[in-house]
């Protein structure tokens, strides 16, 4: 029995729930990426921080092209994510170069820096897979990439001090997509512990707990900033 076939009876009983969670995560993230593309070209600003974007694309590349997981639904969604993410990378670099940055070196070489950063993250996932195994890299690494994006998006919101380049739709789809996937992982850990019990560990619980905290904090700050911006518009009118 491996980690992707010959399901035990305990997991077979909840497998339909798991499939719904995977489909929910896939659809929510796909919608999130499409909305992100629209936001980038509408507001002419990066919607996703470059660090988390590179980490996320590297994970998708690793899953789709390097360590293909034998689960068709998951592979289809990952392939679609990767394609849309290429547009996000293009848009993010394009709008970033339209604005003058404090570091002219970074500003000038951004089209080179981003691909190198993605390759660096891919090599990190590859090294991790050689160290701890493919399933742990794909699923544990995916949770970590999601956590990095949550923290990075909150930092970007605080650094900008405005809702420019963000939206409630982006936040909601990211939250629903992330936690549908994480709940699915914990479901496997509980009902298929022989292969997936490793996921229910202190690090994964910490990542999940911290991500929930950051996402709630993000929503509160985003709402506050939105209210302040509306009030400012009212005063100008």
Swiss-Prot record:
Mutant phenotype after disruption:
Accumulates 2 uncyclized prenylated polyketides, sartorypyrone E and poxygeranylgeranyl-triacetate lactone.
Q: Does the keyword Transmembrane apply?
A: yes
A single cellular component GO annotation: membrane
- Keyword Lyase attributed: yes
* Reactions the enzyme catalyzes: (S)-(2E,6E,10E)-epoxygeranylgeranyl-triacetate lactone = sartorypyrone F; (S)-(2E,6E,10E)-epoxygeranylgeranyl-triacetate lactone = sartorypyrone D
The pathway to which it is assigned is: Secondary metabolite biosynthesis; terpenoid biosynthesis
Instruction: Name the principal localization, coarsely classed.
Output: membrane
Residue spans crossing the bilayer: 17-37, 47-67, 71-91, 109-129, 138-158, 167-187, 206-226
Family per similarity comment: Belongs to the paxB family.
Q: What is this protein called?
A: Terpene cyclase spyD
Organismal lineage? Eukaryota, Fungi, Dikarya, Ascomycota, Pezizomycotina
């Amino acid at each position: 029995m491996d980690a992707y076939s010959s399901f035990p009876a305990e997991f077979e009983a909840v497998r339909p729930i798991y499939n719904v969670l995977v489909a929910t995560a896939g659809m929510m993230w796909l919608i999130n990426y499409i909305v992100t593309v629209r936001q980038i070209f509408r507001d002419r600003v990066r919607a996703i921080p470059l660090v988390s974007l590179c980490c996320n694309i590297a994970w998708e590349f690793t899953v789709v092209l390097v360590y293909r997981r034998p689960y068709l639904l998951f592979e289809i969604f990952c392939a679609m994510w990767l394609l849309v993410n290429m547009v996000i990378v293009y848009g993010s670099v394009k709008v970033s170069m339209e604005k003058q940055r404090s570091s002219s070196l970074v500003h000038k070489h951004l089209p080179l820096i981003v691909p190198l950063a993605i390759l660096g993250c891919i090599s990190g996932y590859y090294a991790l897979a050689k160290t701890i195994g493919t399933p742990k890299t794909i699923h544990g690494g995916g949770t970590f990439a999601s956590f990095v994006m949550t923290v990075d998006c909150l930092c970007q919101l605080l650094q900008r001090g405005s809702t420019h380049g963000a939206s409630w739709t982006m936040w909601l789809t990211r939250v629903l997509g992330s936690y549908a996937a994480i709940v699915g992982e914990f479901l496997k850990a509980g009902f298929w512990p022989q292969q997936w019990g490793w996921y229910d560990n202190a690090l994964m619980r910490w990542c999940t707990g911290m991500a929930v905290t950051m996402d709630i904090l993000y929503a509160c700050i985003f709402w506050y900033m939105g209210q302040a911006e509306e009030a400012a518009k009212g005063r100008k009118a």
